[in-house]
Amino acid sequence: MKYFFASDIHGSSFYTKKYKESNASKLVLLGDLLYHGPRNDLPKDYCPKEVFAMLNECKDDIIAVRGNCDSEVDQMVLDFPMQSDYCIGVFNDIYFFITHGHIYGEDHLPQLAKGSAFIYGHVHLPIAKKSGDIYILNPGSASLPKEQNPNSYAILDDDIFTIYDFDGNVLKEIKLEKNI
């Protein structure tokens, strides 16, 4: 199964459209979906109404967690749950701890089993690495990247986690082994 991971859309309709083009089976949203937050500039094509309409069209394919810019008001317009701070899923036989990153992060990991993947957003940086027995993954920011990185998203296809820019260039890639 093919999974599309996106974080920190921040209301950008331009970057939300990429999921439909990907032919992925599931869309995993790592928070900060609609609002840009008081510290960020407006992202390209900022239109939260268009974003929630597009996301609601594929609500049955979405797994989502809450980001620090997401609110109860956002949940009122979304037809899928996104108020949990984290969720645990199994994708292609690998355990994933999915969170935004404002509570748990690379420097504050939850207890994870050997071979698990910790995937988060929040820092707006693309990351794909192994740290000890845990995979640390971050698709980067779809709309407001930091440190001169391009706008990005990730695809998990079989056991390969690949981070792409929106021109289709591979930024980072890692093979996830089931039992490290």
What are the roles of these predicted feature ranges?
Residues K2-H10, I94-H102, Y135-G140:
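Active-site-proximal beta-strand elements of phosphoester/diester hydrolases
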Residues K2-F91:
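Core catalytic region of metal-dependent phosphoesterases/phosphodiesterases
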